[in-house]
Each structure stands twice: as C-alpha cells, then as structure tokens.
Amino acid sequence: MTTQVPPSALLPLNPEQLARLQAATTDLTPTQLAWVSGYFWGVLNQQPAALAATPAPAAEMPGITIISASQTGNARRVAEALRDDLLAAKLNVKLVNAGDYKFKQIASEKLLIVVTSTQGEGEPPEEAVALHKFLFSKKAPKLENTAFAVFSLGDSSYEFFCQSGKDFDSKLAELGGERLLDRVDADVEYQAAASEWRARVVDALKSRAPVAAPSQSVATGAVNEIHTSPYSKDAPLVASLSVNQKITGRNSEKDVRHIEIDLGDSGLRYQPGDALGVWYQNDPALVKELVELLWLKGDEPVTVEGKTLPLNEALQWHFELTVNTANIVENYATLTRSETLLPLVGDKAKLQHYAATTPIVDMVRFSPAQLDAEALINLLRPLTPRLYSIASSQAEVENEVHVTVGVVRYDVEGRARAGGASSFLADRVEEEGEVRVFIEHNDNFRLPANPQTPVIMIGPGTGIAPFRAFMQQRAADEAPGKNWLFFGNPHFTEDFLYQVEWQRYVKEGVLTRIDLAWSRDQKEKVYVQDKLREQGAELWRWINDGAHIYVCGDANRMAKDVEQALLEVIAEFGGMDTEAADEFLSELRVERRYQRDVY
C-alpha cells in the first residue's frame, strides 16, 4: 500500500516531516499500513477541532468532475494539471480515476471532463473499460443536463489512433450531452496541445462553474491523488544496471533478459503491479547509418527544446528512431517527392502497413533523398521512455528493481534491426552502467488487501513479470491465500522463464497450482486460454471462493482470447447465458477482482 498525497504545494507536511513519515512506514506490510491508516483516522475523529475544520461535502454545491482514464500515466498527468489549473481559478473540482468512478452517477454530472488514453486496438485503458461498457449499454442514461469535454491521448503509429477518446466523445454527445469544446486528439508529443486545451477548458468553465471557498477547492481537488516522489518521468533517477542475464535457452527463438537495476540509497519505492519507466539512448551505429544515408555529417547544429546540439547527439538522446509511423512516411514522401512513397499518400491502410514493416532508416535507404539536419529533426517524433512491468518486490530485493525484457530483434533484407529500449538494456549498457529510470504507479493492478484471498495469475511470455513480484510479496507477507499460475511459451526446455523459482514456490507451498501451456512442443498448439478451459470447473470454484484474477501480456490477441475463455468458463460452470456471463465478468472488474496489465 502506498501513501497517497496531493502535490507538494498542497501538502500539510514539510519535506522533513514527509521524509520521517516515509521512513517510519518503509518496512510495514500492507496489512500493517492499513491498520496504521485506521489508527490515525481514529485519532483524527477524536479531535473536535479537526471535525470543526472539515469543509462541507462537495456534493452540497455543483462542481466539475474530471475523469482520468490512464494506461501509462500520461492521461493522469494531464488530468492532474487541469485539476490544478481549475483550483488556481478557484473553481470547485473533483478528480477521480475512471476505475473508482461510480458510473451510475454520471446522469447527475453537470460539468464533466474526460481525459483518456487508448490501448490495444482502439480500446479504452483498463481502468475505464467498465465505464466505457456502461455508456455503450442499454443502461446508459440520458445526459441532457451534462456539458462535457474530452482530451484524447494516443500514438499515431497505431491504426486506431485516439479511438477511446473518440468513443467517449461521440457517446456522451449521443446521450444528449453538450460539448463544451471540440475533442482534442493528441499524439505522443502531447504537452503543447494539452497546455492549450487546459487553458481553453478553464476559460469555458469560469462562466459556468461556481467559485469554491479555498478549503473546499483544496479538499475536493486532492481526491484520488496518486503518489509523490522526487523522481519522475521528467526527472528520472540515474541508477545502475547490476545484472543482465539471458533466461531463454540457446535454441530459443526469443531473447528474454532478466534485468536487475540498483536503486542505491535513492529511497525510490514501488509496489508489485507497478511499472518501471526506462529512458534509453539510440544505438550510435543506427544514428551513424541514418546520418550517412542522408549525406549529412552529424555535427550539424540543430535546435532541441531551445538548446543547440550536434545532430548526432540529438538523434541519439532525443528522437525516436526505431518506430516508424504513417505520418512520418507521408511527410517524408511529400518532403522528398519520392516516387516510391508518393503513391501511398492518402491511403491510410497502405501507409500504416508500410510504417509497421519498414523502420525509418530502411525507409530512407529504399527511398534516398538529401535532407538538411533541421528538416530531419522536424520529421521525427520525440523519444519517449518504455515501460516494463516490475518483476520484483522490495519486500525481498530491497533497493533493487527487476524487469523481464523481451528483446526485439529482426532483419530487414539481411540487415539486423532491434528495438530501441530492449536492445539498449540487453546490448549497450555495461554492468554498473547508468540507466535513467522512474516508477509508473499502477493502482489498477494490485494484490488483494486481504492476504487470505485466492489469486489467479495468467501471464504467458514476458507477461510473467508482475507475477514474480506478486509471489515475492505473498511469500514475504506469509499470506495464507492460495495462488494459481497459468504460464505459456513456445517450448518447455527453452522458454520456461524463472523455472527454478516457480518450482521452489510449489515445493514450499506458496504456489498452490501451476498450469503450463507449450505451444510448439506438440502437433497441436496449446495456449494459456486452452488451459483455462481445461481447468474450468476448478477455476469456477476458485472464483466462487472470492479469487482475484490477473492477466498480463499482449493486448491485441492473448488478452482477448483469455477473456473469451473466462467468459466461456463462467457461462458453462456458472449456468449463465452469454449476456449474464459478460455482466458477471464486468462486475468482477468493477470490484477489482479482474485486473489486467496488457500492452
């Protein structure tokens, strides 16, 4: 359990007091933290002065509700910044995570702002799935008294760019809501668009929302604030890589690395279920190849965020080189008048396919042109950190953080290519080398608060990572609840990630059951969803006993296939029709008994 606090400007504690509080709670288990929380709440409620100072409930006056639907933290940061802007304007505002929002109250909202990202094939973030499903169901209410605005974050390298925001925007209007502002669809480089949009939202709401008393605006504005740390995406910790171990066999088609990073005395804290953000540098050899293909030298001065840098340095540290997009292909075609690429312009499907199959450097190789350095920089997108599900618990590893990295490797016409962050960690950071990292907290993927609750973990491939953290935590807490793992990969002998650890947990009785699916070890392919169906009766018994279900891994295929298998198990062994099974699984999601970390 992580203490949740508002931004430093709103903290009632000074930095020294906050440090003492964090130090005092570092070694407490989730159960102990919950008790301490209750203890202080009891102390507070025994003090009449504290009660007298409590502001009136926000429900007594209408205000603004911001719903944050975030997958990687960007949407949450935009929502929090908007909340702070509205508080500064002395407006009554409430910020709530989509997963905590009681969506049946949406009909009573007068002023509603939705900030959402998109995942997978145009799907809403995990924490917003239940709200999305409700709004698109027959149960959705009319919203004639609701004015709304939507800010949508996405990645134009994907086909269904900002689809979740488009869905929310169109459905809220269809239900009778009034658009305060047109929807904004923001790409990876979203900050400028978000800043402009926030200013327009504040202006639009000043004339429509009541001004709150300072105590009320602060109290409601701090609702569901997530975490605080001296380190963040924009101010990462410079840590050191201590272990880089290949954990797939010599003959495996996959290169999977177990990476351990030493956090030193930074005090950086995380929980099982969180992700590690990794800032990486592009391969100097890739930078050199791209520069030479464009007949540049690499020492040309370019401007990056107001600073003048040599082109080589800018490309290595500041720009995305390993992920192509339809926009880049289209802009390069138009800029260079390429005879090969111009026929693709205007055809979205062909542009998407070309971008997905042709890295930027090979696009330039196949369609050579001469660009000046600034034109190249303007063509590219800013480099963004990669997120990896954390594979460790600090209850066991203390000042370390572990991740499980599937290294992306492929060939383009005989030339070896690799993923930016995965090859950085696997190939280019030496032992004790520097790695810039931060924690991306994920409160939508948490172990049950009750240690007696059974846990079902479904994680093929590198989706196994958070469940290693879960088991370390359950073992450290001596949690009596049962644990069941479903894992799959191509081959038993080559791809059984962390095999010795799982066998030890089984022997010690910590891991109650383990079901394994090896897709290439026999004639018929077997996947984790097949194992779920095979164990349907027992799975249903666990669910009836209150088990929490966790899924981690590929969003596009695996997660959908697993969900379909779960629906079939619920329908068959729960005696339900398809609609009732879907409703049952939706209720599990709302109750936080069905959680997914998919990508």
Swiss-Prot record:
Component of the sulfite reductase complex that catalyzes the 6-electron reduction of sulfite to sulfide. This is one of several activities required for the biosynthesis of L-cysteine from sulfate. The flavoprotein component catalyzes the electron flow from NADPH -> FAD -> FMN to the hemoprotein component. This is Sulfite reductase [NADPH] flavoprotein alpha-component. The lineage of its organism: Bacteria, Pseudomonadati, Pseudomonadota, Gammaproteobacteria, Enterobacterales. It comes from Shigella sonnei (strain Ss046). NADP(+) binds at S519, R520, K525, V526, Y527, V528, Q529, D561. InterPro entries: CysJ, CysJ-like_FAD-binding, CysJ_Proteobact, FAD-bd_FR_type, Flavdoxin-like, Flavodoxin/NO_synth, Flavoprot_Pyr_Nucl_cyt_Rdtase, Flavoprotein-like_sf. GO terms for cellular component: cytosol. Residues 64-202 form the Flavodoxin-like domain. FAD binds at residues 322, 356, 386-389, 404-406, 410, 419-422, 599. It holds the Pfam family Flavodoxin_1. Its cofactor is FAD; FMN. Keywords: Amino-acid biosynthesis, Cysteine biosynthesis, Electron transport, FAD, Flavoprotein, FMN, NADP, Oxidoreductase, Transport. It catalyses: hydrogen sulfide + 3 NADP(+) + 3 H2O = sulfite + 3 NADPH + 4 H(+). Belongs to the NADPH-dependent sulphite reductase flavoprotein subunit CysJ family. In the N-terminal section; belongs to the flavodoxin family. Pathway: Sulfur metabolism; hydrogen sulfide biosynthesis; hydrogen sulfide from sulfite (NADPH route): step 1/1. Binds 1 FAD per subunit. Binds 1 FMN per subunit. Alpha(8)-beta(8). The alpha component is a flavoprotein, the beta component is a hemoprotein.
